[in-house]
Amino acid sequence: MDFDETPSKLVPREFLAVVLAGFGNELQPLTSSHGEEPCPKALLPIANKPMIDYPLTWLEQSGISDVLLICPTAHRASISHHISDISSSSYPSLRIDLQAYEESPELAVGTCTVLRHFAHRIEKDFILIPCDFVPPPSLPLSTLINKFRIESKLDGAITVSCWFQHPDGGSVPEEWGQPAPPVPIVWDKRSGTLLHVDTPDDVDRNGEELELRMSLFSKFPKTSLSSRFQDSHVYVCKRAVIGILQQKPLFDSFREEFLPWLCKLQYQKTKQFKYGRDIYSASQNAPHSLALRHSSLYTGKTATKWPSSPTDEVDSPPQKVAPLSAPSSPVDTHDGIVGPPASLRVGVVVHETGVTGRANNLATLLELNRHFLTQTTWTLPTDQENRILIDPKSQISNDSMIGQSTRVGERTLVKHSVIGKHCVIGRMARIVGCVIFDHCVIEDGAKLDGCILGLNTKVGAKAELTRCLTQAGYEVDARGVHRHEKLEVSDWAAASSATDSDDHDSSDAAGETTDEE
């Protein structure tokens, strides 16, 4: 054998990361456009860092290099500008393929629809990640990837999902909207198998009880049930999952429709018989499958078997069960192999340590910003250019963040707040528990408490805002008082137009009176 011979073909890369960046309707008015300029959800800041940077960093740390980033057409230019700036410095190892699709905030497109549309670009096993996921240091992506690598071959798993402890979070005004409550899930702890995810249809049909099939319990007699966990929307999937999606054109939501359906493949024989062979045959050519066959740890056995006919085992009708929690143990089914027959398992990693979140609603966006304030200590800038912008008589607490090129005026108080770049904070202002985006202006004597201000917001002198949100470009009048409101440019513009109209009518009336005299 010639060891000096250079191989003619490179080993293909194992995974493609598919990062989804949607409109962020639950984050309005922060994501509402500023005139002709869009405000992409992916670029909203968390601790003065665009939220999309968190999953991109996570990917790079895991060794993933190929990224398919999908966003609405209206956001493509803004996101392209951002990743072009960072790709050569912050993320040199990532090869980001930015693709856009036609969508509007009024007609949002679900994850399943997007994946079907870009199926031709997903040619290998893939990792699905939302742009709003903020992972903790205690959860490396390699935890999910390694679980998938082993179980997809040795146990026939088709995907691995990740769920995390639902944060309590702080209270937010009802006007901000409340995040959706976590959904009940049933899983097997010992094997790490997700068995059931409640759907909106399940809740509408019977909101008091779960309906589970006896065939589930015959495979996994000891299961755990909880509603304490939230879906991260991070999935490591076989390429064959895309093929199944193309056979299910009516599925739109991955979490609410497709994932619960995938769980049923594990214990419903008719579904296993119909889809199992396609999934299995597609997996045999995967690079990691070939490697595992030559591994010293590989036994040559798998739990992946398919029934000879869909009638080998008749699916039992759903049974109503009360909430339960017990140590789990799968059943020995085939020659001592642990796992259900015709596995097609949906693996699950349930993470319970460290602050984790999805910034897909206003409450979580605020809480994640506040969390990062506890991880840092503010000090005066070391460079003279930024240092002179902070008045020595201002008071800035250690648990605050001030962005570059931001000016803070005399006797201004900043406490437990994040202030972005290129902002101007006037004299004697008071800012407590707020998140202020870039390029905002807070004039003298203004008071802000528990607010999130969008890009280019201007707050007039001595105005008072309590737990308010502002759309990018909004202007608060001097001495204006607002509490628990979403302040949008359309409302402000309408009010300004009404005032101008009243002034115009008054002028016309005065002119008519003068003419009569």
Go through the PLM ranges and name each one.
Residues T382, N386-Q395, S400, T406-V408, ...:
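A structural motif detector for beta-strand N-caps
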Residues E464, A472-E517:
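C-terminal segments of enzyme domains that contribute to small-molecule binding surfaces
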Residues D2-R370, T514-E516:
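Unchanged
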Residues G24-E26, R76, D168-G169, S191-G192, ...:
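Generic "edge-of-domain/loop-turn" microfeature
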Residues R370-W378:
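C-terminal, non-catalytic macromolecule-binding modules
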Residues A282-T311, K447-G480, K486-S490:
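A broadly tuned preference for mixed-charge, low-complexity surface segments
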Residues I129, I158, K264-K269, L380, ...:
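Short C-terminal domain-edge/linker segments immediately following a structured domain
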Residues S142, K274, T377-D383:
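Flexible, disordered linker segments and immediate boundary regions flanking tandem C2H2 zinc-finger modules
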